[in-house]
Each structure stands twice: as C-alpha cells, then as structure tokens.
From Swiss-Prot:
Annotated organism of origin: Yersinia pestis
Swiss-Prot/TrEMBL keywords: Cell inner membrane, Cell membrane, Membrane, Transmembrane, Transmembrane helix
Keyword field contains Cell membrane: yes
Protein name: UPF0208 membrane protein YPO2564/y1623/YP_2375
Annotated localization: Cell inner membrane
Main subcellular location of this protein, as a coarse class: membrane
Recorded topology in the membrane: Multi-pass membrane protein
C-alpha cells in the first residue's frame, strides 16, 4: 500500500522542497541504478541554467523574424516550464513516505551511523525521501565509502 504525499503543501512549497531535496541528495554513482534522483537532478540543474536564456533567444528570434507573438510566447513558456517540472517532481518525491523495503534500508544506514559513534537525530513518525537524502548525505560525509557495500 502506497501512502500519498501530504496534500496540505502549496505548489510554491513543493518547488522549494524540490530545490532543497536536489541540493541535499548525494550525487554518488552507486545510488544511480537504484534511485532516479541522480538523473532528474542533473537534468533539472541543466534546465535551470540553460532554459531561460533559450526561452529569451527563441522569443526574440521569432519576433525579429516577423513571427506571431502567440507561438513565440508559448515556446518560451514551455522552455521555462521544463525545469519547474523537475523541481515539482523532486518536491513531491521529497515528501513521499519511504516504501517498506527502503524503510528497512534507511534503518540499517541509520544504525551504521549510530555504531560509528555519530549522533543521530530522532526519526520522524513516517520517514520520507527527504529524511533518506539527509541521512545518506551525512553517511557519505562521516562514514567510509564502503558503507554501501555492507548493506
């Protein structure tokens, strides 16, 4: 049974949480086969960087060549909307509760941090992907790189 993310979060907060999740998620190659976050993060960062200038270029180019204003604006809005879709997906993913298989893995990584003598924050009632990202980021910083091999 999949629990749906909280519906009380506004669309702006979802985008903010997506940006925070994108910054928090560790960009480690060993996580890429299991989690799509690495690919979504790379594409979203690319879109944030290059789509607004592309939108301005296509808008001015179509207007300068005598094109109609409607399609030019639609193209520019589409180009600017692509990175927003990535942030929206990441924001929704950040507030989604972990499935049972990942929940067990979450507790194992948390236990490894505890065994290493690191102070661990109390667990939320229902851990989310954001709490997994925070835990993994901390584990990659404070544990040796082979901690994933043992799990």
């Amino acid at each position: 049974m999949t629990i749906k993310p909280s519906d009380s979060v506004s669309w702006f907060q979802v985008l903010q949480r997506g940006q925070h999740y994108m910054k928090t998620w560790p960009a480690d190659k060993r996580l890429a086969p299991v989690f799509p976050e690495n690919r979504v993060t790379v594409v979203t960062r690319f879109g944030i960087r290059f789509m607004p200038p592309l939108a301005i270029f296509t808008l001015t180019w179509q207007i300068a060549l005598g094109g109609q204003l409607g399609p030019a604006i639609a193209t520019a809005l589409f180009a600017c909307g692509l990175p927003l879709q990535g942030l929206w997906w990441l924001g929704k993913r950040a507030i989604t509760p972990l499935p049972p298989t990942l929940l067990q893995w979450f507790h194992e990584v948390r236990h490894k941090l505890f065994e290493a003598g690191q102070a661990v924050a109390p667990i939320e009632p229902i851990p989310t992907y954001q709490s997994l990202a925070d835990l993994l980021k901390r584990a990659f910083k404070q544990l040796d790189k082979t901690f994933l091999d043992d799990l």
